[in-house]
Design a protein with these regions (language model features):
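Structural signal for the C-terminal ends of transmembrane alpha-helices
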Residues: 26-37, 130-140, 199-208
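Long, hydrophobic, well-ordered secondary-structure blocks that form the structural core
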Residues: 140, 147-210
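Membrane-interface loop-to-helix entry segments
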Residues: 10-18, 110-128, 180-195, 284-288
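Hydrophobic core of alpha-helical transmembrane segments in multi-pass integral membrane proteins
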Residues: 13-32
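N-terminal signal-anchor transmembrane alpha helix
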Residues: 46-68, 226-237
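Membrane-interfacial loop-to-transmembrane alpha-helix junctions, especially the N-terminal start
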Residues: 42-47, 147-160, 216-220
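Extracytosolic (periplasmic/ER-lumenal) interhelical loops and adjacent juxtamembrane/interface segments
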Residues: 2, 66-113, 243-286
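Short, strongly hydrophobic alpha-helical membrane anchors
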Residues: 1-11
Length: 288
């Protein structure tokens, strides 16, 4: 597939319709269940629904990664210019015939596209959350009321900007052919989106902030940083296919300090390559 073909916006409106369909059921359920709730309760419920669907999306993204389906449809946002693998049956069959165990097969194409459908649905839910916050706040202002601080639009619109950036990384993951740094950032932004939505849901509870001892606060921040480092390292292992570089545990090839090559931590390089275009040595995978 040529560089020109990597982005094909022809199926964009069809994919947007699919995203609306994915979001329609949870939105309908939310409207019915929260029809008599207060504004903050309605927003909290919608945030929790969005959080649940986003968590499912992250899990399915991991499944997409584990099944090596990230390039099941090698263009973006559709699949060979179609909204579903059905419309790309001829192209997928040709690719699968040429490489039966390659990156493009019918099953991998469906896995990748379902991941994109879920991502589009999450985008619709987050857009709905931002628009609902704006509308409820506007209604209070029109009624001459002091706007509820919980209805401040900064959080929802920040979340919307975040998910748009996450979508951009999702596109680059495909068009840059699983470039390790991009795939790792895509993972971390996905986990970060979960954290942002959780913080937003807690905020809508309206609970008063509690004082935290300085020592505990420092410990929590340290744990937070270590958690993100570990998530990043785990993503780097996965994106570089380095998980089996050490087949034993807790040693590596029977050694506590095996031979290592730190080129594995050169960030800006293609998959399996060094920054100067050479094949990445096995010792680099061991170091990762």
């Amino acid at each position: 597939m040529s560089e020109v073909d990597l982005y094909n916006l022809a199926p964009m409106f069809q994919l947007m319709a699919v995203g609306l369909a994915v979001a329609a059921l949870p939105l309908a359920w939310w409207l019915w269940k929260q029809r008599s709730a207060t504004p903050s309760q309605r927003l909290r419920a919608l945030t929790l629904i969005t959080l649940f669907v986003t968590f499912d999306l992250v899990l399915f993204g991991a499944f997409t990664r584990l099944t090596d389906s990230g390039l099941g449809c090698p263009d973006w946002p559709g699949c060979y210019g179609s909204a579903t693998p059905i419309g790309a049956k001829v192209e997928i069959t040709a690719a699968q015939t040429a490489m039966p165990t390659g990156p493009v097969t019918h099953s991998k194409a469906w896995i990748e596209m379902v991941h994109r459908y879920l991502a589009t649905g999450v985008g619709v839910l987050i857009l709905s959350l931002a628009l609902m916050t704006w509308w409820l706040r506007r209604q209070q202002i029109r009624a001459g009321q002091t706007p509820d601080p919980l209805l401040h639009p900064v959080w929802p619109w920040f979340t919307l900007a975040w998910v748009c950036l996450q979508g951009a990384f999702g596109a680059l993951t495909v068009t840059m052919k699983l470039f390790p740094a991009i795939v790792t950032l895509h993972l971390m932004f996905g986990v970060g989106l979960l954290a942002v939505l959780m913080a937003q849901a807690v905020r809508y509870e309206g609970a008063a902030a509690r004082a935290v001892p300085a020592g505990l606060r420092r410990g929590l921040w340290l744990a937070f940083v270590l958690l993100w480092v570990q998530i990043g390292l785990g993503g780097w292992v996965s994106t570089n296919y380095a998980v089996l570089a050490c087949p034993d545990f807790p040693t590596c090839h029977g050694q506590w300090l095996p031979a290592m090559n730190w080129q594995g931590f050169d960030v800006w390089r293609e998959l399996g390559m060094t920054p100067d275009g050479q094949l990445l040595p096995f010792e680099a995978l061991v170091s990762i």
